[in-house]
């Protein structure tokens, strides 16, 4: 246990700061917010790899923890006696030691390294950036231990992964810089393009994916605005609800259907499938009603996460020399708090990084708050 700020303990220096030993922790992201250790293993990720669920430490709170937490005092952990924190830590240790011993061989696996280092470090960096609001600086908290591997993002009663455009909450998110701007990028037809990568299908570059598929849905050379909108709905339904017979002869969906059943065959034969980039083994231990379509949906959401983390790491490398901050990532979009003099460079360079040599085109939006961002031509 490493006390950070508690009246009952005085610590002048911390052991392990020389990074000479491997550190196991229930929450690597939280630890990195306080001390930037190297050689940190996240036990939550180890558990997620073998059980596909999250560790729950709520039941390990002592009576003292429950007393202070229920009253919602500011800085409540400073009020809990240090011996009670130690008691809770002992309970946590007892609960995770078996996981640590069971997964010793997994620690060196490249797929584990991808999530333990690239994914968690990247999400920790986003969290550290903070989200400036009219009420002061707020912070997000990404949960990677979901059944699909796609992070959720909520903290302090706010679901940052699903902020409404109607209730005014987005208006509160503004730049921390004087005359600063919010800048957002989102991918065009992201899942369709990710799937095309998986099945080696090339969409034409001179037409939108939704228009390209819509022409085949409706058998027309030119779509109305209404048909273009319906094209998006049809694609979504076919991808996540199953491919109807009337669309099976469309080349893209014919290949998608073949890929889905290849995934299913691999799962039935091996007992798992491997994620597209990191090669993480997905066993679906705790997934009810597993079927070919559900496996495909899980595969795509995890592929999305892996791809997003790779480009996000590159974005942080670029921003390391600038004042602009990467403050939020939500499935197919990325939000930045931009220092105005850096806007031209940031807009150009981050667009290049996200698009990956035009494989995944993005749209760009800017405004004075997250609520009033408008599409811009780039």
Map each language-model feature to its residues.
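Non-catalytic, peripheral interaction segments enriched in hydrophobic/basic residues
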Residues: 114-118, 126, 130-133
